């Protein structure tokens, strides 16, 4: 029979995965900034430190919450045992009526209620946090355009999935794999436009031909996160301008030479614990409903 992981083991496993994911994310961020670009390198160092601090704080809070829950669980269990023993001593007939299974169910229900209360409290505290404030600013910008955020899953493919969603809305059938393949192929065939922006994280030197090929292979065949370099390639492949809306910075447009309707993406720095994420946009629901009516 398989051993069931304890809550502590599950949390430790989750934390290890999140740390590993963060390191992969940081590596991707470093690769996208040239070594000789001191201004962007300085900003990158600050961004990485912030991401690491946020993840560390998140893990610390989760450990505190788990430890608190564990203490309360033991306390509740002892209280329940004390009450049960007293009742059983005063009325032995209750021993048969109150089963151990029922006690476990009651204890679990009480613990779950406590957990839900803590989550609710955390949500209230988060209203003043970076993620919430970023969301408010983006919504304000989008409402002016009669748009709203279209959530895209955070799986490493978010940028490509957001572009895929935009293309689908235009009746263009280009899937995730095809977008990745075409992006990688364009970068391979225009290596001089991309290699100066990619450096080996260990040496700081510009990528060799072999390292660049590995990078392109990852673009095509893995869930490697896509950034501005990949957006540049996608804009050229699709021959469409790509606009990126951000909360605290002006919008940027890649591929302005193409006089066609823009693909619009949302760039979010605080959407998830691991940092950057891309979402798509869709018509504002209330406006869409009015037009349909």
From Swiss-Prot:
Spans annotated as Cys-loop: 152-158
Top-level class of the enzyme under EC nomenclature: hydrolase
Catalytic residues of the enzyme: 155, 158 (nucleophile), 277
Catalytic activity: Thiol-dependent hydrolysis of ester, thioester, amide, peptide and isopeptide bonds formed by the C-terminal Gly of ubiquitin (a 76-residue protein attached to proteins as an intracellular targeting signal)
PROSITE patterns: OTU (PS50802)
InterPro entries the UniProt entry points to: OTU_dom, OTU_OTUD6, Papain-like_cys_pep_sf, Peptidase_C85-like
Biological processes per GO annotation: antiviral innate immune response; protein deubiquitination; proteolysis
EC number: 3.4.19.12
Region annotation (Disordered) ranges: 1-43, 57-114
Name of the molecule in the record: Deubiquitinase OTUD6B
Recorded name of the encoding gene: otud6b
């Amino acid at each position: 029979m398989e051993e069931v992981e304890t809550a502590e083991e599950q949390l430790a496993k989750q934390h290890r995965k999140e740390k590993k994911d963060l390191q992969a994310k940081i590596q991707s961020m470093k690769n996208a900034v040239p070594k000789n670009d001191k201004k962007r390198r300085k900003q990158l160092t600050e961004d990485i430190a912030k991401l690491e601090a946020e993840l560390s704080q998140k893990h610390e809070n989760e450990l505190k919450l788990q430890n608190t829950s564990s203490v309360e669980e033991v306390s509740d269990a002892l209280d329940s045992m004390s009450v049960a023993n007293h009742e059983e001593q005063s009325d032995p007939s209750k021993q048969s009526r109150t089963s151990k299974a029922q006690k476990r169910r009651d204890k679990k229900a009480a613990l779950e209620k406590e957990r839900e209360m803590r989550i609710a409290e955390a949500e209230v505290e988060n209203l003043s946090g970076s993620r919430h404030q970023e969301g408010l600013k983006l919504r304000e910008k989008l409402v002016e355009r009669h748009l709203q955020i279209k959530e895209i899953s955070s799986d490493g493919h978010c940028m490509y999935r957001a572009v895929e969603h935009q293309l689908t809305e235009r009746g263009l059938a280009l899937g995730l794999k095809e977008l990745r393949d075409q992006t990688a192929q364009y970068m391979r065939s225009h290596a001089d436009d991309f290699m100066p922006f990619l450096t080996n994280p260990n040496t700081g030197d510009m990528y060799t031909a072999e390292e660049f090929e590995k990078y392109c292979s990852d673009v095509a065949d893995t869930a490697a996160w896509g950034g501005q370099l990949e957006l540049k390639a996608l804009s050229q492949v699709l021959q469409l301008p790509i606009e990126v809306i951000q909360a605290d910075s002006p919008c940027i447009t890649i591929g302005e030479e193409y006089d066609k309707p823009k693909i619009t993406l949302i760039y979010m720095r605080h959407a998830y614990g691991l940092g950057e994420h891309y979402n798509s946009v869709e018509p504002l629901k209330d406006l869409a409903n009015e037009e349909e009516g």
